[in-house]
Structure formats: C-alpha cells, structure tokens
Amino acid sequence: MTTLRLLISDSYDPWFNLAVEEYIFRQMPATQRVLFLWRNADTVVIGRAQNPWKECNTRRMEEDNVRLARRSSGGGAVFHDLGNTCFTFMAGKPEYDKTISTHIVLAALNSLGVMADASGRNDLVVKTPDGDRKVSGSAYRETKDRGFHHGTLLLNADLSRLANYLNPDKKKLAAKGITSVRSRVANLTELLPGITHEQVCQAVTEAFFAHYGERIDAEVISPDKTPDLPNFTETFARQSSWEWNFGQAPAFSHLLDERFTWGGVELHFDVEKGVITRAQAFTDSLNPAPLEALAGRLQGCQYRADKLQETCEALIATFPEQESELRELANWVAGAVR
C-alpha cells in the first residue's frame, strides 16, 4: 500500500487552504508522505508569532479586499496572489527532512529548464547577469513526531503590491535599501515566458513521484469537496476566525492621539490576544466625562475597528449632549486601528 498522498486545491481561499494543511498535518499517519499544492487569491500571510497591526497596512488591505491569514509556521509576512504557486511537503519523523523536499522542488525547476540553488535556510535562487535572484521562499514547522516544509514559487506575482500592504521595518530598509530588496526577487515568467501554475504543479508532482519511486492519483479538493476530512469544519472555523488571525498577536501597546475642535485626546491601550486589557484616556476637553467613561468600557473590548466604534457610539445614550463629539471620536478610533 502506498505511503504517498497528493492533494491539489481548487480553492483560492487562504483560510481554506491553510486549514487543509493544518488538518492533514495533524491527522495523517506518521508513515505518510504528503504533497499539497495550492495557491491563494490576494492575501497577506503572516507568521505564527507576528503582530498584524505592526506588520500590515490593515486599512489598505480592507479597502482592497485583501485577506489576512496567519499560518502555523514561523517567519515573516508575505503577499500571495494567483501568481504564486504554493507547496507543502509533510512527513513523519525520522523521515521528515527539509533537504529532501528542497531537492524535489529544485528537481522540478530543473525539469522545466530553470537551474536554481538553495540559498541560506529558506530561499531558492537563480543566477542572472544581475546576480542571484530569489524565486522561492519557505517556512517550516516541526512537532514531536512530524514536520512540514511549505513555500511559494513566484510565477507571475505582482511584486509591486508587496509594499502596498506590508509596513516594512524601517531599520531593515535603511540597512538593505528598497531597491536591493526588490531586485533580488524574480518571477519564473522572466525565465520561462508563458509558464503556468498547472505546469509547475505537474513538474513538482513528477519530481515527488520520482524521488519516492511511486505514483498515486491526486485528490482534488475544494470547499465543496473535501475527501477524508471528517470534522474539517472545526479546523476551518479556527483558521478563518478573527481570534486566530488577529487575536493570536503577541501582547502590545498602542497610543492614539488626535486634536479635535473640542479638545485633544490621547488613548493608551494594552492589548493581549487581540483584547484590550487596559485602557487610559486623557483629554483637555471641557467635558471629560465621556472619555473617562470610555476608558472603562474599552477594557475587555476586542481590538478591532467595528467593536471600538460600537463601544464609542454606545456612550451617546449616556451623554446625548456630546453626540457629535462622540461620533467624531468613534470614526477616528475605528480608522486609526484599521
């Protein structure tokens, strides 16, 4: 009986695809070797321990209908669109070895006519007259008895959009320079004009089969067709939840300040697991009572624009004479945390 499993997703939903990855990883026998091929529509994917409010321009993402998805592996934030082909290799220990999966991807690229090399811990690069250029990045996760290696291959990704949705580390940009970061990335279409997602998936699949000396039929999956995934809805609900994608952020503090015609306002938040654990409000308004009441009500509130706006506007019933000020405050707070 084969120990291989091949899954190909027909869905572009990042929450679905990452939920499938998580489910298969948890449920597979430790003797199984899995290849999962997928791609996401416009999404910022962040590492397991990252803070989306720090890493991402969440307001612009909301305006452009770009999703946020937290993965279960570490590492940094990346932008996915349909110009990326994503792969995940899973295996039980001691067989799990990321050098094997890296070898399979390199063999797939070689079969397409692209000579690439592994560089550092996470990247695959091609040599060009302008120097090495990255065509693939990876991340990894291991538990006691299994591990996975997942990554992307840049086919025809819109590289310019990365800067639209990520808030770069100013120190990192100052050290590397924006042009050097941009220039070291390449799409495979620059090397192989016309290359498609389907061709890349086929090449990776054939390299996977060749390495293990077995062939199996692919399981094509989508939200309407999830073979052998009992109780998958629970995993999907977690992966798509605000509590996972935003609420799993490390604890942080946020200071908001603004001057209105009726007075200056400072709001100090301490946030843990996406919930405000401590709030302080300072103002030189002639009527500070609404702000003082707001600080108490914000404690325990989720750190999300709609909830903060609702909490601010709920004060109107108590302070109807300050309705215009409170609506102005509510709109400002909601906009500041988007």
Swiss-Prot record:
Its UniProt pathway annotation is: Protein modification; protein lipoylation via exogenous pathway; protein N(6)-(lipoyl)lysine from lipoate: step 1/2; Protein modification; protein lipoylation via exogenous pathway; protein N(6)-(lipoyl)lysine from lipoate: step 2/2
What does the UniProt keyword field contain? ATP-binding, Cytoplasm, Ligase, Nucleotide-binding
List, for all copies, the residue spans of the domain called BPL/LPL catalytic: 29-216
The GO terms this record gives for MF are: ATP binding; lipoate-protein ligase activity; lipoyltransferase activity
- Reactions the enzyme catalyzes: L-lysyl-[lipoyl-carrier protein] + (R)-lipoate + ATP = N(6)-[(R)-lipoyl]-L-lysyl-[lipoyl-carrier protein] + AMP + diphosphate + H(+)
**Binding-site positions, ATP:** R71, G76, A77, V78, F79, K134
Positions bound to (R)-lipoate: K134
Q: Where in the cell is it found?
A: Cytoplasm
Q: What do the Gene Ontology cellular component annotations say?
A: cytosol
Q: Name one GO biological process term.
A: protein modification process
Root EC class: ligase
Annotated EC: 6.3.1.20
TM helices/strands, residue ranges: none
Relay the record's extra comment: In the transfer reaction, the free carboxyl group of lipoic acid is attached via an amide linkage to the epsilon-amino group of a specific lysine residue of lipoyl domains of lipoate-dependent enzymes.
Protein family (similarity comment): Belongs to the LplA family.
Quaternary structure annotation from Swiss-Prot or TrEMBL: Monomer.
Q: What does this protein do?
A: Catalyzes both the ATP-dependent activation of exogenously supplied lipoate to lipoyl-AMP and the transfer of the activated lipoyl onto the lipoyl domains of lipoate-dependent enzymes.
What's the name of the protein?
Lipoate-protein ligase A
Task: Tell me what gene encodes this.
Answer: lplA
